Regions:
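ATP-dependent phospho-/nucleotidyl transfer catalytic cores
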Residues: 3-5, 21, 28-32, 55-56, ...
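A short, low-complexity linker immediately N-terminal to eukaryotic Hanks-type protein kinase catalytic domains
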Residues: 12-23
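Conserved ATP-binding subdomain of kinase catalytic cores across diverse folds
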Residues: 26-30, 34-44, 48-177, 253, ...
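Active-site Asp-x-Gly
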Residues: 63, 232-300, 336-342
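Small/polar glycine-rich anion-binding or flexible loop at a beta-alpha turn
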Residues: 305-315
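Zn-dependent metallopeptidase/amidohydrolase metal-coordination segment
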Residues: 321-336
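Long, compositionally biased intrinsically disordered regions
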Residues: 356-359
Length: 372
């Protein structure tokens, strides 16, 4: 038996507020997430074990839990409707959140902490490493399906939980402020990297200008399209459910696609010190693009598909200037393991940008072929 007073949460209070039946059995902490505290909790309900996922929302980052949960529940409800219309298993294809006693989808405890609960999806697994083109193609198919399912979602009903998250020009201005202020006295030693970033300032306007002209539609975007945010079915290996929806908000489909390529098609780790190992894997780019477009192409505009290759470079560049800017500011945002960590990350991103520029024509050809 657990000593309930030793638990990192008041399970009796939470269970009562979310009307969870049965007796609490056990819990396991999940350590994959970096923002919220997540637990799988099990209850014995008349001899049957029922599992739920319990999360403490990080209100230091997500200061408006009402807006946050409005986005998430709106999106998951929309996906559920699409799955049911298609005759598919909606309980496995999207997250199902429980409603608290006050009608909201989170519960605030006596300490002021906010908790949410959704039904646990069984017989699935997550991946942290892309060990084959097949895995990455399945990931592309899953995120493409996510985009397709939400292509008719009313964008005006979404809240912007993190303002200007992928406004690359705004990120560039933040970077230039970091260069000018040079708080950590590091700018002189990285002048070559600063020049690399400044030389590509014009790229930061491209997608924003297309939005301004009405050439790119705002979509529901996930904004954290990592491999481990997909639940894969244990039997079929298909990506069946997209999770970690905290950063769902209005944006461009190109942001999600480009960021997937940035982290997934790099031949080296994000913090590889030997930049000669850094390059864009064209086979992985092709695999993800093929999977993504197999699901999403009918819901995307011609302009969106035209800029898919470019968006891969832009998201990589944006990440690079964020790492370098944080290095210049004294490493105040990203967690680092050693003093030069953000600098190493920036060098890796810029090396990937340079390689993408060399391969841009081939990336565009691959995209065009995947559309046929």
């Amino acid at each position: 038996m657990f000593n309930l007073s030793a638990l990192p949460f008041d399970i009796d209070c939470i269970a009562a507020d979310f009307s969870i039946n049965g007796n609490f059995k056990e819990y396991n902490a999940l350590n994959d997430g970096h923002i919220n505290s997540t637990y799988v909790v099990s209850f014995d309900d008349k001899g049957e074990t029922v599992k739920y996922t319990l999360q403490k929302i990080n209100t230091g980052i997500f200061k408006n839990p009402d807006a946050l949960m409005s986005n998430i529940v709106g999106v998951t409800t929309h996906i559920r409707s699409a799955l049911l219309k298609a005759g598919r298993d909606a309980d496995r294809g999207t997250l199902t959140f429980l409603k608290a006693a006050d009608g909201k989808y989170y519960f605030r405890d006596e300490n002021g902490d906010c908790w949410r609960v959704y039904k646990y999806i069984d017989k699935v697994y997550t991946c942290n490493i892309i060990d084959s083109a097949e895995v990455f193609e399945n990931a592309g198919r899953a995120f493409g399906e996510f985009q397709r399912q939400l292509s008719d979602y009313p964008i005006d009903s979404l809240f912007e939980t993190i303002p200007k998250f992928h406004d690359t020009y705004s990120r560039f201005l933040d970077f230039m402020s970091a260069v000018k202020e040079d708080r950590a006295g590091r700018a002189e030693g990285v002048r070559e990297l600063i020049d690399f970033a400044v030389a590509r300032e014009n790229d930061t306007h491209v997608l924003l200008d297309l939005i301004e002209r009405g050439s790119l539609p705002l979509r529901v975007t996930h904004n954290d399209t990592k491999l481990n945010n997909i639940l894969f079915d244990r039997d079929s290996n298909d990506g069946i459910c997209i999770i970690d929806l905290d950063t769902v908000m209005p944006g461009l489909s190109l942001y999600d696609f480009g960021d997937s390529i940035r982290f997934g098609a790099n031949t080296a780790a994000e913090d590889e010190k030997d930049v000669s190992k850094v390059s864009l894997s064209l086979p992985l780019y092709e695999a993800y693009t093929r999977g993504y477009l197999s699901s999403a192409k009918d819901s995307l505009t011609e302009t969106e598909t035209e800029y898919m290759a470019f968006s891969s470079k832009l998201m990589t560049y944006e990440c690079g200037i964020r790492f370098l800017g944080d290095y210049l500011n004294g490493d105040v945002y990203f967690k680092t393991d050693y003093p030069e960590h953000n600098l190493v990350r920036a060098k890796t991103q810029f090396a990937l940008v340079a390689d993408m520029e060399k391969k841009m024509d081939e990336m565009r050809r691959i995209t065009e072929n995947a559309l046929k």
